[in-house]
A protein has these predicted regions:
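A solvent-exposed interaction/effector surface
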Residues: 1-156
């Protein structure tokens, strides 16, 4: 786990709310964003992100945005939001393993930050910038136990 300074990164994504039981609908948003970008000849980063604003559960809804970072800011529309990950210090780590086990890595990162005296950027229950970036292409590595996912939380 580490702290690293990052510059602003433009994004294009679709924001939704869903419980874990509805997560298939969330996962379906990635291909939709890719189609939207391709129709505009915009090259996305190879790794999709999931930006979490509110963490939910099987019964309570997550507020999540699924998308891709892009080289320069793009105009959004009614469906795809143009945004950015803000400039700042981020607490970062990499989860290696099945996505179903990623909550443990999130908890470890939050505990580590607290132990270092680092306050993560939140406004009540809403995270300012907390996201997962999926580093492994499932078409290349089909075993989810080998997948790598970067977790990043903006420092307050």
């Amino acid at each position: 786990m580490r702290v690293e300074k990052r510059g602003a990164q433009p994004t294009a994504g679709i924001r939704t709310t869903a419980t874990l039981a509805e997560w298939g609908e969330v996962n379906a948003l990635g291909p939709e964003v890719l189609e939207w970008l391709a129709a505009r000849d915009i090259q996305p980063a190879p790794a999709p992100y999931y930006r979490y604003r509110v963490i939910g559960s099987f019964e309570e809804k997550f507020d999540v945005e699924v998308g891709y970072t892009v080289a320069t800011a793009v105009p959004g529309d009614d469906r795809v939001l143009a945004g950015e990950f803000p400039t700042g210090d981020y607490v970062v780590t990499t989860h290696v393993g099945h996505p179903d086990q990623i909550a443990t890595t999130h908890l470890a990162l939050v505990d580590w930050a607290a132990g270092q005296g680092i306050t993560l950027a939140k406004d009540g229950e809403v995270w300012v910038a907390m996201y997962e970036s999926y580093q492994t292409d499932p078409a290349v590595e089909p075993d989810p136990n080998s997948w790598r996912t970067e977790l990043a939380y903006l420092v307050a």
